[in-house]
């Protein structure tokens, strides 16, 4: 503390002012270095009157702090209270600016970081969900294929039969498919064969229906005229026709049969039946006998 009547020329006053000026200059330069890379940090230029001490304040009296310093040195008198207050306020302001700039630069932007973290977590969770969904779909596909091969082995009979070349080993997928293809081809052939048989049977049914209709008409005609034709052919004529047919057949039978053994007789009988009892041969024999009887009667 200085006395109210102390002169600015006092060495103690000069030393105190020089120390304050030096401290203020060091603090300003430190703040300038710390705030050089920060946006909005307060900086003091070398021409600032606060860095130049009392001389700077005398040259630039427009600064508020310089007004108090100039008043303290006016009229060759020094007001220690005003000087200490000015120095204290300057140091407090510089310290507050330094703390504010440091805190402003050190406090992180929590909203942006939270949003970035949430986006990264959402991306990771989305990738995990897609990976799990893909894994589940792939597992379902493999299970469906496995069930299909198991069903084929159960349905196809050739897959159930044991192949001795393979042994007791499990059938591979290629073998199951090949056996299935072979079985399907076999089913197609059987289907075609059965369709042909069905077509033949349908034709036979149609022919039988026509014959049935014809026989029904013959029966109906005979029922309408039951006595028609009874007196036209006598029993003697019928016997003569039968006798003529049998004589012709016996002639060929007697010429073809050998009775040396039972085996030869059996062979000759079957050979004679196949040769002389055909429909066309019998037809010719009957026509010839009828012509002979006609000539005899008329």
Curated annotation (Swiss-Prot):
<dbReference type="GO" id="GO:0046983">
    <property type="term" value="F:protein dimerization activity"/>
</dbReference>
<dbReference type="GO" id="GO:0046889">
    <property type="term" value="P:positive regulation of lipid biosynthetic process"/>
</dbReference>
<feature type="modified residue" description="Phosphoserine">
    <location>
        <position position="77"/>
    </location>
</feature>
<dbReference type="GO" id="GO:0005634">
    <property type="term" value="C:nucleus"/>
</dbReference>
<dbReference type="GO" id="GO:0006913">
    <property type="term" value="P:nucleocytoplasmic transport"/>
</dbReference>
<dbReference type="GO" id="GO:0005654">
    <property type="term" value="C:nucleoplasm"/>
</dbReference>
<dbReference type="InterPro" id="IPR052207">
    <property type="entry name" value="Max-like/E-box_TFs"/>
</dbReference>
<keyword id="KW-0597">Phosphoprotein</keyword>
<comment type="function">
    <text>Transcription regulator. Forms a sequence-specific DNA-binding protein complex with MAD1, MAD4, MNT, WBSCR14 and MLXIP which recognizes the core sequence 5'-CACGTG-3'. The TCFL4-MAD1, TCFL4-MAD4, TCFL4-WBSCR14 complexes are transcriptional repressors. Plays a role in transcriptional activation of glycolytic target genes. Involved in glucose-responsive gene regulation.</text>
</comment>
<dbReference type="GO" id="GO:0045821">
    <property type="term" value="P:positive regulation of glycolytic process"/>
</dbReference>
<feature type="modified residue" description="Phosphoserine">
    <location>
        <position position="48"/>
    </location>
</feature>
<dbReference type="InterPro" id="IPR011598">
    <property type="entry name" value="bHLH_dom"/>
</dbReference>
<feature type="region of interest" description="Leucine-zipper">
    <location>
        <begin position="194"/>
        <end position="214"/>
    </location>
</feature>
<keyword id="KW-0539">Nucleus</keyword>
<dbReference type="GO" id="GO:0005737">
    <property type="term" value="C:cytoplasm"/>
</dbReference>
<keyword id="KW-0805">Transcription regulation</keyword>
<protein>
    <recommendedName>
        <fullName>Max-like protein X</fullName>
    </recommendedName>
</protein>
<feature type="domain" description="bHLH">
    <location>
        <begin position="129"/>
        <end position="187"/>
    </location>
</feature>
<dbReference type="GO" id="GO:0061629">
    <property type="term" value="F:RNA polymerase II-specific DNA-binding transcription factor binding"/>
</dbReference>
<keyword id="KW-0678">Repressor</keyword>
<feature type="modified residue" description="Phosphoserine">
    <location>
        <position position="45"/>
    </location>
</feature>
<keyword id="KW-0010">Activator</keyword>
<feature type="compositionally biased region" description="Polar residues">
    <location>
        <begin position="98"/>
        <end position="109"/>
    </location>
</feature>
<keyword id="KW-0963">Cytoplasm</keyword>
<feature type="region of interest" description="Disordered">
    <location>
        <begin position="98"/>
        <end position="119"/>
    </location>
</feature>
<dbReference type="GO" id="GO:0003677">
    <property type="term" value="F:DNA binding"/>
</dbReference>
<dbReference type="InterPro" id="IPR036638">
    <property type="entry name" value="HLH_DNA-bd_sf"/>
</dbReference>
<feature type="modified residue" description="Phosphoserine">
    <location>
        <position position="98"/>
    </location>
</feature>
<comment type="subunit">
    <text>Efficient DNA binding requires dimerization with another bHLH protein. Binds DNA as a heterodimer with MAD1, MAD4, MNT, WBSCR14 and MLXIP. Can also bind DNA as a homodimer.</text>
</comment>
<feature type="compositionally biased region" description="Basic residues">
    <location>
        <begin position="28"/>
        <end position="37"/>
    </location>
</feature>
<feature type="modified residue" description="Phosphoserine">
    <location>
        <position position="74"/>
    </location>
</feature>
<feature type="region of interest" description="Disordered">
    <location>
        <begin position="1"/>
        <end position="63"/>
    </location>
</feature>
<dbReference type="Pfam" id="PF00010">
    <property type="entry name" value="HLH"/>
</dbReference>
<feature type="modified residue" description="Phosphoserine">
    <location>
        <position position="7"/>
    </location>
</feature>
<dbReference type="GO" id="GO:0000432">
    <property type="term" value="P:positive regulation of transcription from RNA polymerase II promoter by glucose"/>
</dbReference>
<keyword id="KW-0804">Transcription</keyword>
<keyword id="KW-0238">DNA-binding</keyword>
